[in-house]
């Protein structure tokens, strides 16, 4: 990090912001046990908004699911991106 970027501030990239949000969600879920995943619709809407900045997609093109098996939780995101 340079002194100039420190003084002027540097805008975070959307990928790092999304990563931080996902880490917070996962940490919250792990701390609270097996609470219902009521954040999934909001997560799906946010993903559509972010990806729509770069590629034309609709709400139906993204599927988000959370699977639990014993002590393992898997957040799965499937995105259909149209061909150019």
UniProtKB/Swiss-Prot annotation:
It comes from the Bacteria. The keyword Cell cycle applies. GO terms for biological process: cell division; regulation of division septum assembly. Keywords: Cell cycle, Cell division. Signal peptide: none annotated. InterPro entries: MinE (IPR005527), MinE_sf (IPR036707). Prevents the cell division inhibition by proteins MinC and MinD at internal division sites while permitting inhibition at polar sites. This ensures cell division at the proper site by restricting the formation of a division septum at the midpoint of the long axis of the cell. NCBIfam families: minE (TIGR01215), PRK00296.1 (NF001422), PRK13989.1 (NF010595). Belongs to the MinE family. This is Cell division topological specificity factor. It comes from Paraburkholderia xenovorans (strain LB400). The gene is minE.
């Amino acid at each position: 990090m340079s002194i100039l970027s420190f003084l002027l501030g540097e805008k975070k990239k959307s990928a790092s912001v999304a990563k931080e949000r996902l880490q917070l969600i996962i940490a919250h879920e792990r701390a609270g046990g097996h609470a219902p995943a009521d954040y999934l619709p909001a997560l799906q809407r946010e993903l559509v908004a972010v990806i729509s900045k770069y590629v034309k997609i609709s709400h139906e093109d993204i599927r988000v699911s959370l699977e639990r098996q014993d002590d393992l939780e898997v957040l799965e995101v499937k995105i259909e991106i149209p061909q150019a």
